[in-house]
Amino acid sequence: MNRLIILVVAAVFLGMASAEEDVLKRGFPCRCDSDGPSVHGNPLSGTIWVTSCATGWHKCNSENELFHECCKQG
C-alpha cells in the first residue's frame, strides 16, 4: 500500500513538472514581421502575451495593440 502511494505521488509530481515546461508553448499564435506577408499558409511564429512580453521574449511585430503583444522568444 505504501509503495502505491509513493508511486501515485511521484506520478503527480512528474506530471506537474512536465506541465510547467509546456506553459511557454501554449497560447495563441500570431504573425511576426519576420513571417512575411499575411498569406494563407504562412507559419505564425509569435505567441500572444497579455499586456506585454515576458522576460526573455521580445515584441516581434510593428502593430500597436492595446491589451496584448505578439512576442517571440529569444
From Swiss-Prot:
Inhibits voltage-gated sodium channels (Nav). Keywords: Amidation, Cleavage on pair of basic residues, Disulfide bond, Hydroxylation, Ion channel impairing toxin, Nematocyst, Neurotoxin, Secreted, Signal, Toxin, Voltage-gated sodium channel impairing toxin. Belongs to the sea anemone sodium channel inhibitory toxin family. Type I subfamily. It is found in: Secreted; Nematocyst. The modification Hydroxyproline is found at residue 29. It comes from the Eukaryota. Residues 20-24 form a propeptide. It comes from Antheopsis maculata. This is Delta-actitoxin-Amc3a. The modification Glutamine amide is found at residue 73. Residues 1-19 form the signal peptide. GO terms for molecular function: sodium channel regulator activity; toxin activity.
